[in-house]
């Protein structure tokens, strides 16, 4: 088989992936040191986005590298039922059909969503394959598989028995549109402009008043007290008395509580415990009643007739009008404050009293905190470890129940005659069960998806059941987005320590968000979401993989740059053309034999590839993915293609040329697996596949000879630069004096510099190539040299003018602080480039002046 003239990724990628899969190369071998990474399960019902492409690519680089290093590497895939996210999508489908969730029973809805997800699930797996994700597909775990549900139930039962589970009335974050609660960490807080209204609450004799300040006047209809600080001299005499709640005309007490900030507002706070978490805690301390005025459907309840059935926003307007009529409004102030929203639909979250299932987190968090303080898990970046400790130290109890039918049912049943009598039972497919003559009704809520996801490391490795992957737990590392460090990483650590006594992984690498080209967060509403499959279709999987990691550092969000994908596509084409050149010299019978370097270029390329293989390995192991990829790019493009391949055209060492290509394919494989495997298979390097080849080990070379080629490079590079700057388009002669290196490598220098001739001389003339520090001159006449000098002086003036403009821009604090970060960085890069140009031009002009 022969390499085609052009590399068209779509012609090869599906077949290459099929080869990996059918050969068993994706599966663990049981030979070597176990190395495992789990896949944060993407939503089974959806398409991958560009963030998934980054996430999966980083993990796949590690897996491919460790396979080649001889480790028994396994990438364990997963698919997430994505409880709430999937439910939102399916509710949209029902709406299109003119139906509602309330038209069906819970069991009917579960069955419908199950079928919906199974239809979509294959699409996600196909996309992961298209990205080249080398996962062990026979170990794929779906978050609703029996083994997942059984483990989740076992954990829930253990927590139940350990008195870590409780059901109680608490303030929860509630989305009235989807009618489900959320944990604190799932609420998306947005800074919004609003108003702080001051309202007078009259004393019972209607002579005096207390002024409170609130951003939500509508909730005053549910006030049960006014709180002041016990040390506030303004209100000390009023503590213990009662005051009149406007509109409702109900007497409520004035209480003292140290929570109140005397310096904020008027120092008097309305207490609405059913709709504010802080007020709820105050009410508990003072044994005050709870009065809900907003229903789960987002309507006003238990309020005067004129407000019944209104939305909170509608009620706000009416309440303010009523207060105006009563002459009880005392002004308003424009403010900016954080407002909680549903992270999926954007609705304002309503704090609401609901009976929910909770996990007591204090005893779970402490072992995790202790392990983190002892640095038993390495974090990249290291600063995130302290951030996670701080989060765990103030962690609240975890609300694990969701009011949606799609998910793992909570295995609990309630006595039909006693709402406080709950039992654990896994017969969740039954509406009711009878135990010792008592009928118990099934809990309708499902688990928060994070409760199962938090157990992912020991579930997918079958650690608790001693399955065939049990030896791969704890996993070696977790790589995920910094945005879910708290929601996922923290909980995996807590639950793994609780269930297994072990940490779930040894290292944590957190990547930042992939933003759009303007460095704005991507969202469907903005229409700026990038579909990686479109990039794969246009540029190929390898280009997408290399492009998406370009310039990335841990935990730093960065703009997506399509230019990086194009550059990576060009790199793949360059690698293909290198292979075609080698194929033309050797054919398709590539047997790697003992190397016999013959020229300085031969010794130099061995040194370069030895160094590259080592540097790439170090950078991968330190999670410096972008730097490793850049090393691959420049080693193959610059060292192999531009220098060695070009120099070898004058003296071909075929066995070494074959080794150079093989080594290039190996170091590039973790980053560009498809094109490298395609070349490897086409040129018949071995009977096996590249994915399972060993990572390159150092080969012997002569360092003196290698350094000689480095000196030749300096000479050629300067000669090329000068010739490119000279007027006209002609070939020049190179004159040299007593220089054995030039004398011994004339053919190579002539070819690389595209010279007319090389001649020895005892009478130097022309322009000396001074930067190379050799006795070498370009044979240039005086007129050409003068024109060259004028051109350089003109370019130097232009460069200095550009430099001044760039400096002025960067000295402007408004630009640096307010311009998009990527533009500021581009300006800094342009400034550095101009400084390099100026240095080069000044140096060249100094040589001419010496002449």
Indicate where each model-derived feature is located.
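Acidic, turn-prone loop/beta-hairpin segments
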Residues: 80, 176, 182-188, 414, ...
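N-terminal, positively charged nucleic-acid-binding surface of large information/translation enzymes
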Residues: 1-231, 255, 272-285, 289-304, ...
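Core structural elements
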Residues: 128, 570-583, 602-611, 629-649, ...
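Catalytic adenosine-cofactor/nucleotide-binding cores of aminoacyl-tRNA synthetases and other
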Residues: 341-345, 514-518, 522-598, 684-685, ...
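Glycine- and acidic
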Residues: 1-3, 40-48, 106-110, 135-142, ...
């Amino acid at each position: 088989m022969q390499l085609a003239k052009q590399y068209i990724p779509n012609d090869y990628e599906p077949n290459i992936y099929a080869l990996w899969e059918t050969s068993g190369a994706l599966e663990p071998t049981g030979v070597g040191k176990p190395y495992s990474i789990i896949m944060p399960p993407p939503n089974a019902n959806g398409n991958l986005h560009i963030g998934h492409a980054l996430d999966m690519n980083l993990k796949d680089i590690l897996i491919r590298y460790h396979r080649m290093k001889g480790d028994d590497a396994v990438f364990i895939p997963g698919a997430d039922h994505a409880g709430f996210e999937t439910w939102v999508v399916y509710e949209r489908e029902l709406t299109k059909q003119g139906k509602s969730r309330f038209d069906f029973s819970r069991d009917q809805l579960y069955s419908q969503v199950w079928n919906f997800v199974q239809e979509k699930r294959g699409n996600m797996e196909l996309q992961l394959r298209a990205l080249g994700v080398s996962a062990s597909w026979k170990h794929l775990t779906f978050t609703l598989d029996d083994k997942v549900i059984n483990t989740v139930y076992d954990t829930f039962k253990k927590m139940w028995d350990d008195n870590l589970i409780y059901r109680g009335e608490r303030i929860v974050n509630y989305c009235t549109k989807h009618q489900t609660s959320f944990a604190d960490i799932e609420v998306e807080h947005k800074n919004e402009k609003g108003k702080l209204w001051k309202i007078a609450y009259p004393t019972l004799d209607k002579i005096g008043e207390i002024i409170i300040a609130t951003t939500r006047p509508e909730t005053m209809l549910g006030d049960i007290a006014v709180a002041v600080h016990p040390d506030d001299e303004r209100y000390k005499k009023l503590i213990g008395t009662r005051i009149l709640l406007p509109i409702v005309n109900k007497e409520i007490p004035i209480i003292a509580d140290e929570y109140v900030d005397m310096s904020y507002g008027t120092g008097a706070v309305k207490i609405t415990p059913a709709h504010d978490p802080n007020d709820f805690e105050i009410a508990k301390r003072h044994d005050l009643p709870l009065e809900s005025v907003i229903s789960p459907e987002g309507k006003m309840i238990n309020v005067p007739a004129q407000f019944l059935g209104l939305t909170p926003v509608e009620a706000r307007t009416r309440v303010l009008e009523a207060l105006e009529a009563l002459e009880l409004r005392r002004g308003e102030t424009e403010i900016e404050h954080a407002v909680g929203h549903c992270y999926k639909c954007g609705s304002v979250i309503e704090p609401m009293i609901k009976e929910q299932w909770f996990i007591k987190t204090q005893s779970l968090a402490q072992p995790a905190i202790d392990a983190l303080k002892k640095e038993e898990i390495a974090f990249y970046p290291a600063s995130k470890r302290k951030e996670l400790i701080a989060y765990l130290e103030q962690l609240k109890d975890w609300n694990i129940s969701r009011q949606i039918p799609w998910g793992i049912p909570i295995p609990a049943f309630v006595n039909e005659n006693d709402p406080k009598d709950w039992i654990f039972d896994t017969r969740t497919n039954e509406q009711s069960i009878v135990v010792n003559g008592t009928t118990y009704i099934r809990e309708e809520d499902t688990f928060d998806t994070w409760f199962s996801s938090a157990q992912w490391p020991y579930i997918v490795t079958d650690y608790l059941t001693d399955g065939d992957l049990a030896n791969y737990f704890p996993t070696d590392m977790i790589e995920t987005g910094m945005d879910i460090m708290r929601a996922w990483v923290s909980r995996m650590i807590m639950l793994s320590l609780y269930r297994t006594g072990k940490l779930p992984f040894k290292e944590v690498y957190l990547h930042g968000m992939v933003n759009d080209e303007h460095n704005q967060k991507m969202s469907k509403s903005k229409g700026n979401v990038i579909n990686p499959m479109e990039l794969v279709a246009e540029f190929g999987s390898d280009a997408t993989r290399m492009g998406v990691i370009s310039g990335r550092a841990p935990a730093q969000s960065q703009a997506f740059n399509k230019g990086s994908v194009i550059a990576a596509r060009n790199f793949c084409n360059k690698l293909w053309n290198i292979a075609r050149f080698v194929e033309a010299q050797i054919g398709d019978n590539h047997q790697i034999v003992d190397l016999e370097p013959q020229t300085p270029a031969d010794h130099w390329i061995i040194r370069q590839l030895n160094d590259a293989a080592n540097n790439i390995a170090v950078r991968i192991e330190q999670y410096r993915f972008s730097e490793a990829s850049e090393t691959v790019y420049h080693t193959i493009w610059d060292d192999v293609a531009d220098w060695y391949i070009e120099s070898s055209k004058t003296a071909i060492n075929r066995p070494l040329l074959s080794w150079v290509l093989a080594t290039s394919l190996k170091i590039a494989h973790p980053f560009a697996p498809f094109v490298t495997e395609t070349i490897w298979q086409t040129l018949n390097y071995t009977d096996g596949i590249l994915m399972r080849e060993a990572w390159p080990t150092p080969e012997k070379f002569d360092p003196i000879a290698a350094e000689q080629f480095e000196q030749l490079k300096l000479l050629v590079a300067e000669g090329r630069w000068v010739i490119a700057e000279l007027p006209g388009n002609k070939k020049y002669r190179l004159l040299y004096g007593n220089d054995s290196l030039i004398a011994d490598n004339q053919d190579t220098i002539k070819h690389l510099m595209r010279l007319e001739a090389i001649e020895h001389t005892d009478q130097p003339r022309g322009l000396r190539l001074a930067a190379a520090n050799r006795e070498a001159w370009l044979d240039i006449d005086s007129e050409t040299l003068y024109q060259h000098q004028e051109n350089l002086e003109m370019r130097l003036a232009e460069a200095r003018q550009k430099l001044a403009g760039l400096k002025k821009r960067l000295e402007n604090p408004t630009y640096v602080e307010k311009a998009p970060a990527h533009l500021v960085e581009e300006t800094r890069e342009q400034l550095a480039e101009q400084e390099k140009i100026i240095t080069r031009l000044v140096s060249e002009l100094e040589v001419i002046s010496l002449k």
